Amino acid sequence: PVTLHNLMRADRAAKALAEAAVFGTGPAARFPLEVGAFLKSDPGRDLPDLQSHFLPGRSTAALRLPFARGDARGHGYFANVYQMRPDSRGEIRLTSPDPYAAPAIRGGYLTAPGDIATLRAGVRALREIFAQPPFDRWRGAETGPGADRQSDAELDDWIRATAESVYH
């Protein structure tokens, strides 16, 4: 298999990390985000407004012990999609004249109506990519958002429930 599943066993992960640290080789010597893409939510846009990262592993993967029973989730892959320039705006406010006091932060994620539509277009673009014949051998059931979520409203609910910021 070509995923990271086998490396999610603690003894194998430790061996791979040691090999990477000592020799600079092996599966842990490179970052596992295999592919990145810039996409347009609308073909009429001049520039891409979405970014995606592909990982050859399940988003639900967890490190497991060698003597534990196998991970039923097994092999898989996933991709995330992010809006590069959202219209939504949050705010950071001072809560006190004390410079050490924590500020009040409101993210304001997905408050601009166009942002959710942009992310929805990104989810649909990833579905289209993963529906291509080269993925036939590896494709299983879609776990997120799930094949049962097809309408705009269903996808919007899923996006609101799972979206997070990755930019730093």
Predicted regions and their residues:
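Acidic/histidine-rich catalytic neighborhood
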Residues: 1-16
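FAD-dependent oxidoreductase catalytic-site/capping-region signature
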Residues: 17-168
